[in-house]
From Swiss-Prot:
This is Uncharacterized protein HI_1098.
Length: 44
């Protein structure tokens, strides 16, 4: 993952909020997929 030095504080904050939202969405999808696998394989 590239690392950038952003000096504009407002831009930095907006990027950080967007990245956090994206990460939360991806995590929720992974948890949901994992739950589906467990339900189909183990919990029957």
């Amino acid at each position: 993952m590239p690392v950038y030095s952003i000096t504009d504080k407002d831009l930095s904050k907006r990027i950080q909020l967007k990245e956090n939202k994206t990460l939360k969405e991806k995590t929720a999808n992974y948890v949901s997929e994992g739950r589906a696998v467990l339900t189909d394989v183990i919990c029957k």
